[in-house]
Regions:
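C-terminal catalytic "cap/lid" subdomain
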Residues: 8-251
Length: 251
């Protein structure tokens, strides 16, 4: 008798989230030790993780930060006009977006970059219906350029795009394995939340995302999952519905 072994992890029928918005910190792309703004090894790892869930049939939208290149808020403290600084930051996210597209396509994942500011020789402008069409055709879509406006973070851009594309969840990939009561690097007694409500996250002003991003997800009923991107197959486990990191929702 032949035995059929089913790998539950790779079974498309077990997906909990069919369309996700993945928020990746720009700082995670950089390497402070080597001074590289974009570390090829880290970029390749990220692309490989995205490929795994794309192969499962998950429709993937990605928003990248730009902190590895330039952060508008930091620049404002060093004499750069805030609006100009944020514009520089938005351009940084486009650089990261093009790098991610290149890394994904190098491993066979069809990808498009859509920007919030017109830069048509490099990428498509963001048009909601066109983005949905890309998903239908099996493409990963990288949303770059933030919201296209100063004073809005890339976390808020991620919440906005997640709302516009009707994402089942916003997955925020960080260097830590969830949201804590305090900074675990500074406070040894800090405890990780398994789950919490949007209102609590807003009330406690938890710094993992800004209040505008939390509020936008709350208003549109989009759950947020904060997890450690470098924890092996964490991304796969999240889309399968396993309890990974911290879940922020209305429950």
């Amino acid at each position: 008798r032949n035995c059929i072994i089913v790998d539950v992890k790779m079974n498309k029928d077990n997906l909990k989230y069919n369309r996700i918005l993945l928020k990746l910190s720009g700082e995670v792309l950089g390497n402070r030790e080597t001074g590289e703004c974009i570390d090829p090894t880290r970029l390749a790892f990220m692309a490989g993780q995205v490929k795994k869930i794309h192969a499962l049939g998950v429709q993937v939208g990605i928003v990248l930060g730009g902190g590895n290149i330039f952060r508008g808020l930091t620049g404002a403290g060093k004499g750069v006009n805030r609006v100009t600084g944020d514009s520089m930051g938005m351009l940084a996210t486009i650089i990261n977006g093009l790098a991610m597209m290149n890394a994904l396509e190098a491993i066979g994942v069809p990808t498009r970059v859509m920007t919030a500011i017109d830069i048509d020789k490099l990428a498509e402008p963001f048009i909601q219906r066109k983005a949905l069409r890309h998903f239908e055709k099996g493409r990963v879509v990288v949303f770059a350029g933030g919201t296209g406006n100063p004073y809005f973070s890339t976390d808020t851009a991620a919440a906005l795009r997640a709302s516009e594309i009707g994402a089942d969840a916003l997955l925020k990939a960080t260097k830590v394995d969830g949201i804590y009561t305090a900074d675990p690097k500074k406070d040894p007694n800090a405890q990780r939340y398994g789950s919490l409500k949007y209102e609590v996250a807003l009330e406690k002003r938890l710094k993992v995302m800004d209040s505008a991003a939390f509020a936008l997800c709350m208003d549109n009923g989009i759950p947020i999952i904060v997890f450690d991107f470098f924890d092996g197959d964490a991304l796969e486990r999240v889309v399968m519905g396993e309890e990974v990191g911290t879940l922020v929702s209305d429950k």
